[in-house]
């Protein structure tokens, strides 16, 4: 029987207020393949943390541990903990409902993936799953989410049109609004601008800068310039391990690890 977050007992010591999440000795297996190796890292409250590294290094695998996406496929397994504060809950525990995890930790994928529904229903979907039925509440939450994604002024007069009618950049902002509608505590971005043009990319980056005042953000990007622009903290990953983690300016200007420096400067990648 799964338990609600509110039923969980505190795990470990109380976290300092600046941390939203702690990753403790996290390893992850795709079947018998070890994809992540003993990762330890903090996510700072209401800051942007970027994951960088070459293709296949484990960035997206790590990101998807946070909202239990790997649970959808048999044979995958976690070892270690991801602690969500202030509850001190290990969200990888089998006693924690993954649906509840995904309500608290939302995700925006690489390519815009609107549902085959209206703009309004795309944003309202998660709210309806949570049991919200009153139209006035739905209307308010949908508007708030669309405003939060800087999309309201562009769609307020066509909320009941199909989301597929929006441009690529608008569709991605709609997906962000859908993620915001349930008031998540952490927002995950997996290469959110890789399928967008430079103008739409700049719009999403500005939005991320605005959102960090409200929510903790973890972003995977292959674009190191983007990581430098949008993030407060950066983790460099290689072969399933976090090689170096720290303040973004330090990682990009004066990294401590030579392997990090080689990747940042283009000598390795």
UniProtKB/Swiss-Prot annotation:
GO terms for molecular function: ATP binding; ATP hydrolysis activity; ATPase-coupled phosphate ion transmembrane transporter activity. SMART domains: AAA. InterPro entries: AAA+_ATPase, ABC_transporter-like_ATP-bd, ABC_transporter-like_CS, P-loop_NTPase, PstB-like. It catalyses: phosphate(out) + ATP + H2O = ADP + 2 phosphate(in) + H(+). GO terms for biological process: phosphate ion transmembrane transport. It is found in: Cell inner membrane. The keyword Zinc does not apply. One of its GO terms (cellular component) is plasma membrane. Keywords: ATP-binding, Cell inner membrane, Cell membrane, Membrane, Nucleotide-binding, Phosphate transport, Translocase, Transport. It is an enzyme of class 7 (translocase). The complex is composed of two ATP-binding proteins (PstB), two transmembrane proteins (PstC and PstA) and a solute-binding protein (PstS). Belongs to the ABC transporter superfamily. Phosphate importer (TC 3.A.1.7) family. Part of the ABC transporter complex PstSACB involved in phosphate import. Responsible for energy coupling to the transport system. This is Phosphate import ATP-binding protein PstB. It comes from Nitrosospira multiformis (strain ATCC 25196 / NCIMB 11849 / C 71).
């Amino acid at each position: 029987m799964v338990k609600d977050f509110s039923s969980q007992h505190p795990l470990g010591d109380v976290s300092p207020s600046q941390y939203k999440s702690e990753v403790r000795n996290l390893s992850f297996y795709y079947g018998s393949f070890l994809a992540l190796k003993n990762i330890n890292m903090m996510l700072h409250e209401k800051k942007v943390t970027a994951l960088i590294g070459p293709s296949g290094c484990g960035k997206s695998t790590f990101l998807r541990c946070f909202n239990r996406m790997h649970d959808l496929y048999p044979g995958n397994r976690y070892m270690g903990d991801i602690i969500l504060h202030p509850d001190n809950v290990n969200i990888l525990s089998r006693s924690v409902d993954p649906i509840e995890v995904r309500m608290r930790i939302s995700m925006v994928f690489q390519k815009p993936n609107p549902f085959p529904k209206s703009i309004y229903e795309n944003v309202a979907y998660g709210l309806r799953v949570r049991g919200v039925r009153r139209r006035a509440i739905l209307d308010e939450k949908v508007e708030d989410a669309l405003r939060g994604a800087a999309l309201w002024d562009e769609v307020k007069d066509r909320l009941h049109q199909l989301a597929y009618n929006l441009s690529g950049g608008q569709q991605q902002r709609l997906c962000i609004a859908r993620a915001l509608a349930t008031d998540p505590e952490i927002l995950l971005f997996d290469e959110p601008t890789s399928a967008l043009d430079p103008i739409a990319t700049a719009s999403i980056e500005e939005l991320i800068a605005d959102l960090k005042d409200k929510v903790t953000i973890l972003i995977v990007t292959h674009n190191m310039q983007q990581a430098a622009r949008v993030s407060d903290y950066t983790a460099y990953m290689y072969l399933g391990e976090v090689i170096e983690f720290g303040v973004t300016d330090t990682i990009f200007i004066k990294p401590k690890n030579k392997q990090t420096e080689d990747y940042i400067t283009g000598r390795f990648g």
